[in-house]
């Protein structure tokens, strides 16, 4: 059908009616649950043949039930036939959507919005404004003391205003409150893997023993019977110079003897600068901290 010109798939609005184009797509299903036509053979849900079969089946079913013959099978053939009749439609200059509420079909409401904004002032709502101001606010809502209802010919329709009895004014608005329950912690943040927040501080004097040697410096610190700390500092000064590095490189190795049972050397801090290379090691007794 597609190759013979009897079936078309159009991506766009094709409705033709006295009111012009109203953005309605051509379709043969009315339940709005039709699957889209997937015409890319690379897609896993390619369904051109399936949709063609559905359309043909729907057309045959409609013809058998309603005894209607489709003389124009495609929008293009229908349009060509309309052009062939050489029929001219009168020029339409009034509202294309007279029964709709489109923004370009109704009167402008900006002035009414301004008047309503003024009427929502707290004095206007409670009636505590001056009498002259109250009259002015009422006139702005009406916009004219000679306002009337007119028919399609512009003639005034006879009308009468009847007072409403037992009128209740709904609330002007509402507020929503959300209550959250939270527990306040004065510390602000608990201790974790990257932050240590002690529950207090210890004030006291620790016993220090300082060993100062030509290569190694040590500080022994006894805080209490079960807290004992040793801080060692080793300085290695090895100046190099006067040789060419084009044929190789200079490597410096350090061999550190074991400290004893359960103690290890750990690189706790390192910073590489131009000269020298600073490494700091600390003795650790905890295997997990190695």
From Swiss-Prot:
Influence of pH? Optimum pH is 5.
Record note on cofactor: Binds 1 zinc ion per subunit.
Q: How is its activity regulated?
A: Inhibited by swainsonine but not by 1-desoxymannojirimycin.
Enzyme superclass (EC): hydrolase
Q: Activity versus temperature?
A: Optimum temperature is 65 degrees Celsius. Activity decreases sharply above 70 degrees Celsius.
Q: What does this protein do?
A: Liberates mannose from p-nitrophenyl-alpha-D-mannoside.
What the record says about family reads: Belongs to the glycosyl hydrolase 38 family.
Q: Assembly and interactions? A: Dimer.
Mind telling me what this protein is named?
A: Alpha-mannosidase
Please tell me the species this chain comes from.
Answer: Lablab purpureus (Hyacinth bean)
């Amino acid at each position: 059908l597609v190759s013979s010109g009897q079936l078309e798939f159009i991506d766009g609005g094709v409705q033709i009616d006295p009111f012009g184009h109203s953005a309605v797509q051509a379709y043969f299903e009315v339940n709005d649950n039709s699957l889209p036509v997937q015409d890319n053979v690379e897609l896993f849900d390619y369904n051109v043949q399936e949709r063609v079969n559905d359309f043909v089946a729907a057309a045959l079913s409609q013809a058998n039930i309603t005894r209607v013959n489709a003389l124009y099978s495609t929008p293009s053939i229908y349009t060509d036939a309309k052009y062939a009749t050489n029929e001219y439609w009168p020029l339409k200059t009034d509202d294309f959507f007279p029964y709709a509420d489109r923004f370009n079909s109704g009167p402008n409401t900006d002035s009414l919005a301004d008047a309503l904004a003024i009427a929502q002032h707290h004095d206007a709502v409670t009636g505590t404004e001056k009498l002259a101001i109250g009259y002015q606010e009422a006139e702005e809502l009406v916009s004219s003391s000679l306002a009337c209802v007119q028919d399609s010919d512009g003639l005034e329709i006879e009308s009468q205003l009847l007072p409403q009895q037992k009128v209740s004014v709904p609330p002007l608005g509402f507020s929503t409150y959300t209550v959250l329950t939270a527990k306040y912690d004065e510390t602000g943040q608990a201790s974790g893997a990257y932050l240590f927040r002690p529950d207090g501080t210890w004030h006291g004097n620790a016993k220090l023993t300082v060993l100062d040697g030509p290569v190694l410096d040590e500080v022994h610190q006894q805080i209490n019977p079960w807290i004992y700390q040793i801080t060692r500092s080793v300085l290695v000064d090895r100046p190099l110079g006067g040789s060419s590095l084009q044929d190789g490189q200079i490597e410096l190795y350090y061999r550190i003897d074991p400290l004893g049972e359960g103690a290890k050397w750990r690189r706790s801090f390192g910073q590489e600068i131009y000269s020298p290379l600073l490494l700091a090691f600390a003795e650790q007794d905890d295997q997990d901290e190695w």
